[in-house]
Amino acid sequence: MKFTKMHGIGNDYVYVNCFKETVKDPSAVAKFVSDRHFGIGSDGLILLCKSNIADLKMRMFNKDGTEAQMCGNGIRCVAKLAYELGLIERETATIETLSGIKSLKLNITKGKVNNVEVDMGEPILIPEKIPIIKNESVRIEDKKIKAKFKINKKEFEFTCVSIGNPHAVTFVKDLSKIEINKYGPIFENLNIFPEKTNVEFVEIVDKDNIKMRVWERGTGETLACGTGACSSVVAGYLNNFTNRKVNVELLGGNLGVEWRSNNHIYMNLSLIHISEPTRHLRI
């Protein structure tokens, strides 16, 4: 199997061009390639596939083998790789995902993609569509879907958003003091989230800047998460903590996110890195 390993600000995946390769059991392959000791080492597996409704289709698998609806960092890398492999030949692209078709703009210099802007679509703020089960812990304030929990005498309040996949965003005073490996899996598996959830811990710097750490559903903590950054900006604006255009500082680097007046969220990264050359693997 021929593959390429790429990352967007540290959120790394193994990419396979399924226009030429066949992956019979992507769930099993995802588990293998994600292992940082006995595999290749990644946050998961992403397949570039043919589509009948877009330029191509992206399938994304977490490191535990589960298939996810969408990956913001991954889709930018897909666009870059697809262009440089000749699968698309324009500076715009449409990519089919389980959360719908996404539109992308590619900034190209000397045949290489150095910047990708993604239209992530509109945030989903309806409980049944996130999905989240309404109970005594969940309340709705205007457009905000709030959930409050006390764990080990520590209280957390979440704003819940979907960007094609579920996110629970909580705002904290000091991000460096958050025990993400302790609290991340607890919140990921709360029974109010029937499909589990991604979890973002966010520190407000000012109206234009936030810091974020993420616990990804099916993967654990990662260095970056594009849909998580978008969800955090939506939650920040709804709670009057931020403006609509925000710089999001993650462990792997910075992302620019803007929730525009047309209700669409746009995400921009100045450079996407290829961390390893194309390789061959026998599975």
Q: What are the residue ranges of the model-derived segments?
A:
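Conserved phosphate-donor
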Residues: 38-57, 168, 183-215, 254-257
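N-terminal beta-alpha supersecondary unit
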Residues: 4-52, 190-193
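Anionic-ligand binding region
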Residues: 141-148, 157-159, 170-191
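Helical hairpin unit composed of two closely spaced alpha helices linked by a short loop
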Residues: 227-229
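N-terminal, positively charged, Ser/Thr/Ala/Gly-biased leader segments
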Residues: 1-14, 18-20, 118, 142, ...
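Short, hydrophobic/aliphatic alpha-helical segments
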Residues: 30, 50-66, 146-157, 205-220
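Single conserved hydrophobic/aromatic residue that forms the stacking wall/gate
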Residues: 272-283
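Acidic, low-complexity central loop/insert segments
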Residues: 63-158, 223, 234-260, 266
